[in-house]
From Swiss-Prot:
One Pfam entry name: CoaE
Protein name (Swiss-Prot/TrEMBL): Dephospho-CoA kinase
Keywords from the UniProt entry: ATP-binding, Coenzyme A biosynthesis, Cytoplasm, Kinase, Nucleotide-binding, Transferase
Gene for this chain: coaE
Keyword Metal-binding attached: no
Residues of the DPCK domain: 10-203
Catalytic activity: 3'-dephospho-CoA + ATP = ADP + CoA + H(+)
Lineage: Bacteria, Thermotogati, Deinococcota, Deinococci, Thermales
Residues that coordinate or bind ATP: 16-23, 145, 176
Alphabetized SUPFAM superfamilies for the sequence: P-loop containing nucleoside triphosphate hydrolases
GO MF entry, a single one: ATP binding
């Protein structure tokens, strides 16, 4: 609690498709650190603003409800409509985020943001943690878990900022190329730096 909880240190977790950012988020949660998922907050924001979005995007309404896939198809081929969507959803995401932060009252909070650098989030965070792995390894992981073809995975990769560029921008880079134990060790080193060695994970 105390005054420091009012202004938590917020660290963004990101990584390109198949990097293992969800594994890092799960490790942090298991060690007792709060991790917020920006995609989940965005889904809640869309739900909260559904009536407004239905008026703006009537073509994306299926059976009286806003169809997320139809909405995605509409906006990602039209920058103006994407801007209109973001104008409604982004302020609500920020409101929900502030609500969550005040509810948590934690001195250190992690925020999982898939498109952290692409969407310019780094200016709103105290630091950024990039989970990185070689492209071929990431492609293999995604194909194994999702059933997507190699071409589909590569198309998603091309839609993101190159990992090399993210490496230059990130505060910390976690190399996720070895075992889970290696990843845990690297993550604990970052935590020790963040907390002054006070709580670099348990065990």
């Amino acid at each position: 609690m105390g005054h420091e909880a009012k202004h938590p240190i917020i660290i963004g977790i990101t990584g390109n498709i198949g990097s293992g950012k969800s594994t890092v988020a799960a490790l942090l949660r298991s060690w007792g650190y709060p991790v917020l998922d920006l995609d989940a907050l965005a889904a809640r924001a869309r739900e909260n603003k559904e009536e407004e979005l239905k008026r703006l995007f009537p073509e994306a309404v299926v059976g009286g409800r806003l169809d997320r896939r139809a909405l995605a198809r509409l906006v990602f081929s039209d920058p103006e409509r994407l801007k209109a969507l973001e104008a409604v959803v982004h302020p609500e995401v920020r409101r929900l985020l502030m609500e969550e932060l005040s509810r948590l009252e934690a001195p250190l909070v992690f925020l999982e943001i898939p498109l952290l650098f692409e969407k310019g989030w780094e200016g709103r965070l105290h630091g950024t943690l990039l989970v990185a792995a070689p492209l071929e390894e990431r492609v293999r992981r995604v194909m194994a878990r999702s059933g997507l073809s190699r071409e589909e995975v590569l198309a998603r990769e091309r839609a993101q900022m190159p990992e090399e560029e993210k490496r230059k921008r990130a505060t910390w880079v976690l190399e996720n190329t070895g075992s889970l134990e290696d990843l845990e060790r690297a993550l604990k080193a970052v935590l020790a730096e963040l907390t002054g060695g006070a709580k670099g994970g348990r065990g």
